[in-house]
Curated annotation (Swiss-Prot):
PANTHER family: METHIONINE SYNTHASE. Residues 7-327 form the Hcy-binding domain. It comes from Caenorhabditis briggsae. This is Probable methionine synthase. CDD domains: methionine_synthase_B12_BD, MeTr.
Length: 1273
């Protein structure tokens, strides 16, 4: 095998400087605005499938474009450019029926990139390198594409190996310098790619070139899509010998830092990092500027984290050039010496390190058809669900590796092994640990290796069939990246005595390390634990032989480990489990002291050595060390005595109703059982000796119970729905006590003239949804959780004026005020409340929460208006931490110091330049000076252009408005998107169980999610059957024409203009020929002729009746039910909007009559046309709702607008319908002053937004403040 000189060349450069890899190819291709014919060219002009979007084809059909993009990146400073082959496998190309072109795609892509590198290299005198990009494909080995069949896979390991091998071979033939296996979301796929590449180098004689490997961490959980941590990913793929490893895609640089840092500490290779240009915005675009991204990556470089940096989605040559400049002169990271030298690394979803500090690794033994009759029967009967429970019990009992054996004559071993391993891969609590694939059939071992993404242990190979077969199998195991168990077995048979055991192990070790190239730390010797106490004298020393052989192996074979099947030692005592378990414990005690560091053992059934009865311990040690020839007989007698005595059954049952009243109340609170709480509370109250006052019942047994609830919730052992149910129990108990407490208070006042103002609470919180906003689900949850944690909550409801909030805070002597809001105008109202709190002299902390709020807005806009604590609370649990910290005088100062430093850091990063005075700050950000805006006139010149001569508007089936009253909810159920429902309850699944219904499989929240979902189904049926809610809607279609940035709508009968929807145009700097979008771009212009295009309008609600119904529930202290009803109403409203849009497309407007989309497709927006809402990214101005309401007469359907233009009922949706097939969602983003204020350009009037609407500039700025990109007074 020949090795390229590039290894040394790149290593030398990496010692001198940080290298640069290019940015996004797809982003740059999109900017070329290519059409179908560009992708087809001549070669595919008659192809049977649409090809637009198959970017890899452009290397064949438009190589000029690809060359241009490569050259732009190289001229920007890139050392490496990636070939245009992200989807260049037969598997990915199958979607386009282009499998036959895979060689040409990869070969030509490599040639184009090679030419660009050579040209720029010649011009600059600096050599540039081509990375052959190998993407992940659109299939995964670790995750089933079918929810119903978790063991199903739509691709095999060998199919991926073949596809990756073909791609890599063609890339190398085209002249790439490096192979880059990138965007790895499933380590099993990466292992297939690396397997294919190593096969090319080691078996086909292809000269070896460097390999880079880059994974993708999908979110802040720090895991890949298939669930592995970054460190586990490194362990799983180390056999591919990459010279650089790192991360790309999914995250922006700032969020990627901690994961890159972890990799940097773990890996002795180069580290590469090419993140996205920030996180996607609401419409999937990327907003991070080149300067912002470069500054973050500069910090990576200064901290010694990286050797190669670049960009992924949303990055451009400008980003790469900024990075190139940012790291000039900064020394590259120096890779550390192997941080895990002398240790064995394994992985499941998480890494596992086996070294001296681990002492002993338990290998769970019960998933073995040869060793467990129950497990065998489960597998034979295809009862895999219960079989997985066996695995789960092993892990819960302490197994650190899971042994899986499917060797039974009546089983299809490869099938059973693959199916079981695939099933447990979707069980995070099991899959977190490595697997030991245990079989005497090498085909079963291969099946297992190809069904798991982690680094496994293979159990086993041996010299039984000679050295050649041994080496062949060892090389295969090594290429799959597994560690290996080697049996003390050779051509002469199984070793029993110490010397023979060591002789075979030493010979095997030499072959593996010297001839096969195995890492010594990945070698595990099974020195044969054989059965003692068989009655045969020659077996009596088997225990001692193993222990002595273990000592010799560990002393003479560096790095090697020793393992064995512990239960073999006690096989003579089958049926006497107590004796066997004790024998295993004694054997392990001595074997571990000799150096045995792993063992197949039932981890949950080992007694502690020192807990074994001394007479029994003496007998077992005599037997193990063959010190008493009568030991076997004596042990049998002892076993019979133990059997005669038997074991007392544990008859403990769940009889909580027979416990003390205090324990009953605590149990009811934790479990959320309200059936007996009033009676139990009354029983406690009547015990006046123990609880002289009703308040004492709250302070002691009830608060003791809620303290347990709070602890469990804080530790993540209880979930929000359970907490709310606990609160329901607490509220009922307190409601029962309140009349007695009031009576007591009144009696004290009358008898002694006292004004008792005692409180059992930590503090009082006044909480409200601010004026103009009607959304309260999140606020209600916060109120409940605070109440559960011993805070008195005064809930002022929704649409609460500032003066009412302040008045309530003063009257209630509140310790905190909490403000909530969902819509953007609520942010300004929160600022107003903060100002007023300061004006009237309040000094209590202000808590800010709600979907539209953020820490940045709180720190920059709200906190400076109020010189006392202002805290942004991300969710309900955060509010508890904040209130508790601020209530505890021992931690309050430290908490506030941290908070102030954090907010000051936020303000500094936002480039806040000066304070106006002690309480107020200037809202001028230096960063806004650097923001690149395009003049309004120029943006209009670069509008999104549609060839209107080729577009014939479809006339709707009716013109004017049509109402849909009392709509049948049953028709909406299939359109419900359940993910936001679980978000309401703060139930968020993790890899790969984020979405519905996969969330039910999540190890942490799945059970609770299923319970809440089942409750929702019950409530949904109740709401529908009892006609609690009403769903109304109104839809209107009107003739329309665009004029500049605005859309006029017309009376269908007279042709007179009815009104105008005013539009905002994107104004942030854009590169090359990117369009600046405005909604008016999607409507035929007026200047073309009479209006013959159309605009749709709609408003719908599913919340009529919800507020009244929930009020009754809340009066009955059932917050859980109230939140449930509101959450369901919200989901039904969104479902109604989705249903209406489909009806519009297919029937009412009928511009997409042949649409064949599933509910999933609808939720993924795979249809023609859009329905943007006023106040959202494509038109951020909420005031446009006034025009919409006037034209729709929406009030007739029971939907009204509040003062701040929120919709009431809150469970309502509204917007516009656009039918143009080229219409698309976009975000207006920040706008400059020339789009807001009236100006003149060269005597030509450029009409601005305020002038067109005939509204004062200040009012426009107030409504558009979130997108204003200049300094406001």
């Amino acid at each position: 095998m020949t090795r390229s000189s590039l290894f040394k060349e790149l290593a030398d450069i990496a010692k001198e400087r940080i290298m640069i890899i290019d940015g996004a190819m797809g982003t740059m291709i999109q900017r070329e605005y290519m059409e179908e014919h560009d992708f087809r060219g001549e070669i595919l002009k008659d192809h049977d499938k649409p090809l637009k979007g198959n970017n890899d084809l452009l290397s064949i059909t438009r190589p000029d474009i690809i060359y241009k993009i490569h050259k732009l990146y190289l001229e920007a400073g890139a050392d490496f450019i990636e070939t245009n082959t992200f989807s260049g496998t037969t598997i990915a190309q199958a979607d386009y029926h282009c499998e036959h072109l895979v060689h040409e795609i990869n070969y030509q892509s490599a040639l184009v990139a090679r030419r660009a590198c050579d040209d720029v290299g010649a011009a600059t005198g600096i050599r540039r390198y081509v990375c052959g990009a190998i993407g992940p494909t659109n299939r995964t080995l670790s995750i089933s594409p079918s929810v119903e069949k978790p063991d199903f896979r739509n691709v095999t390991f060998q199919e991926l190996v073949k596809a990756y091998g073909d791609q890599a071979r063609s890339l190398i033939q085209g002249g790439v310098d490096v192979l880059l296996v990138e965007t790895v979301f499933d380590s099993a796929n990466a292992k297939a790619a690396l397997f294919a590449i190593r096969t090319l180098f080691e078996d086909e004689g292809v000269p070896e070139i460097p390999v880079f490997l880059s994974g993708t961490i999908v979110d802040m959980s720090g895991r890949t899509l298939s669930g592995q941590t970054g460190e586990a990913f490194l362990v799983s793929t180390k056999q591919g010998k990459p010279i650089a490893v790192g991360l790309n895609c999914a995250l922006g640089a700032k969020d990627m830092r901690q994961f890159v840092q972890n990799m940097s500490l773990w890996s002795d290779t180069l580290i590469l990092c090419y993140p996205n240009a920030g996180l996607p915005n609401a419409l999937g675009g990327y907003d991070e500027t080149p300067e912002e991204m470069a500054e973050v990556l500069r910090e990576f470089a200064q901290d010694g984290l990286v050797n190669i940096i670049g960009g992924c989605c949303g990055t451009t040559p400008d980003h790469i050039n900024a990075m190139y400049k940012a790291v000039q002169g900064i020394s590259p990271r120096v890779p550390p010496a192997d941080p895990h030298a002398g240790k064995m690394l394994l992985s499941g979803l998480e890494p596992s390190i086996v070294g001296p500090e681990t002492n002993f690794v338990n290998i769970g033994e019960r998933c073995n058809v040869a060793g467990s009759r129950r497990f065998c029967n489960l597998i034979k009967n295809e009862n895999y669900d219960t079989a997985i429970d066996v695995a789960r019990v092993q892990v819960d009992s302490g197994a650190q590796i899971l042994d899986v054996n499917m060797d039974d004559g009546l089983l299809d071993g490869p099938y059973a092994m693959s199916k079981f391993l695939r099933l447990i891969s979707s069980e995070p609590d099991v899959a977190k640990i490595p697997v030991c694939i245990d079989s005497s059939d090498f085909d079963v071992i291969i099946a297992g290796l190809e069904s798991t993404q982690g680094k496994c242990v293979v159990n086993s190979i041996s010299l039984k069939e000679g050295e050649e077969k041994f080496k062949e199998r060892a090389r295969i195991v090594k290429r799959y990246g597994a560690a290996v168990v080697v049996m003390a077995f050779d051509e002469e048979g199984q070793a029993a005595e110490t010397e023979r055991k060591f002789e075979i192990c030493e010979r095997s070790y030499r072959i593996l390390t010297e001839e096969v190239g195995f890492n010594p730390n990945d070698i595990i010797f099974d020195a044969n634990i054989l059965t003692i106490a068989t009655g045969m004298d020659e077996h009596a020393n088997y225990g001692m032989y193993f222990i002595e052989a273990t000592r010799m192996i560990r002393e003479n074979l560096p790095g090697a480990h020793v393992s064995g099947g512990v239960s073999n030692i006690s096989f003579s005592f089958r049926g006497m489990e107590a004796i066997r378990e004790a024998m295993h414990s004694v054997f392990l005690f001595y074997a571990i002291k000799a150096g045995m560091d792993m063992g197949i053992v039932n981890a949950g059934a080992l007694p502690v050595y020192e807990d074994i009865d001394k007479p029994l311990l003496q007998l077992l040690e005599d037997l193990l060390f063959n010190r008493d020839p009568e030991a076997t007989e004596k042990l049998l007698v002892a076993a019979q005595e133990m059997k005669k005595d038997g074991k007392k059954a544990d008859t403990k049952t769940d009889e909580w109703r027979n416990t003390s009243v205090e324990e009953r109340l605590k149990f009811a609170l934790v479990k959320g059982i309200d059936q007996f709480v009033v009676a139990d509370t009354e029983e406690a109250r009547q015990n006046t000796e123990k609880y002289p006052r009703p308040l004492n019942v709250i302070e002691r047994p009830l608060m003791d119970g809620m303290a347990v609830v709070g602890e469990l919730f804080g530790a993540g052992k209880m979930f929000l729905p359970q907490v709310i149910k606990s609160a329901r129990v607490m509220k009922k108990a307190v409601a029962h006590l309140l009349p007695f407490m009031d009576a007591e208070r009144q009696a004290n006042i009358e008898k002694m003239g006292l004004d008792e103002d005692e409180s059992p609470y930590q503090g009082t919180v006044v909480i409200a949804t601010v004026k103009g906003d009607v959304h309260d689900i999140g606020k209600n949850i916060v109120a409940v959780v605070l109440g559960c944690n011993n805070f008195k909550v005064v809930d002022l409801g929704v649409m609460t004026p500032c003066e009412n909030i302040i008045k309530a805070a003063i009257e209630e002597k509140a310790d905190f005020i909490g403000l909530s809001g969902l819509i953007t105008p609520s942010l300004d109202e929160m600022v107003h409340v903060a100002k007023e709190m300061n004006r009237v002299g309040l000094k209590i902390p202000l808590l800010i929460g709600g979907a539209t709020t953020s820490k940045t807005h709180t720190a920059v806009k709200i906190a400076p208006r109020y010189p006392h604590p202002v805290v942004h609370c991300l969710d309900a649990s955060k509010s508890v931490v904040v209130c508790s910290s601020l209530s505890d005088m021992t931690v309050r100062d430290a908490f506030l110091q941290d908070l102030n430093e954090d907010y000051e850091d936020v303000r500094t990063k936002m480039c806040l330049v000066s304070y106006l005075n002690h309480f107020f700050i200037t809202e001028h950000y230096e960063s806004l000076k650097d923001r690149r805006f395009v003049a309004l006139g120029k943006t209009r010149e670069k509008k999104f252009n549609i060839d209107w001569n080729k577009f014939s508007p479809v006339k709707p089936s009716f013109i004017g408005r049509r109402e849909f009253q009392n709509f049948d909810f049953k028709e909406l159920i299939p359109y419900i998107d359940w993910k936001p429902f679980f978000d309401v309850w703060q139930l968020r699944g993790k890899y790969p169980n984020r979405s519905y219904p996969k969330i039910f499989d999540d190890a942490d929240v799945g059970g609770e999610a299923k319970r809440v979902f089942d409750d929702a189904q019950t409530w949904l049926k109740k709401l529908i059957d009892e006609k609690v809610l009403t769903a109304n809607a109104v839809v209107s279609f009107l003739p329309a024409a665009s004029e500049g940035d605005d859309i006029h709508v017309y009376d269908p009968e007279t042709g007179n203009k009815l009104d105008t929807f005013y539009g905002l145009r994107q104004q942030s700097g854009r590169e090359h020929d990117q369009s600046h979008f405005c909604l008016s771009d999607f409507i035929r212009p007026l200047k073309i002729g009479v209006p013959d295009d159309y605009l749709g309008l709609f408003a719908c609600t599913a919340g009529l009746g919800a507020e009244e119904y929930c009020k009754v529930l809340e009066e009955n202290h059932d917050d859980y039910a109230s939140i449930m009803v509101k959450a369901l109403a919200d989901r039904l409203a969104e479902a109604y909007a989705e249903y209406l849009h489909k009806e519009v497309r297919v029937n009412l407007w009928g511009y997409s009559t042949n649409e064949q989309l599933t509910e999933t497709d609808l939720l993924s927006i795979k249809y023609e046309g859009i329905r943007p809402a006023c106040g959202y990214p494509s038109q951020p101005d909420h005031t446009e709702k006034r025009t919409l309401w006037k034209l729709l007469e929406a009030e007739k359907n029971g939907i009204v607008l509040t003062e701040h233009l929120a919709m009431l009922p809150a469970a309502s949706v509204s917007g516009l319908y656009f039918a143009n097939p080229q219409s698309q969602y976009f975000a207006v983003g920040k706008i400059d002053e020339d789009q807001v204020a009236f100006i003149y350009v060269r005597s030509k009037n450029v009409t601005d937004y305020a002038a067109r609407k005939n509204v004062p500039k200040e009012e426009v700025e107030r409504w558009l403040s979130p997108i204003i990109g200049y300094e406001l007074d």
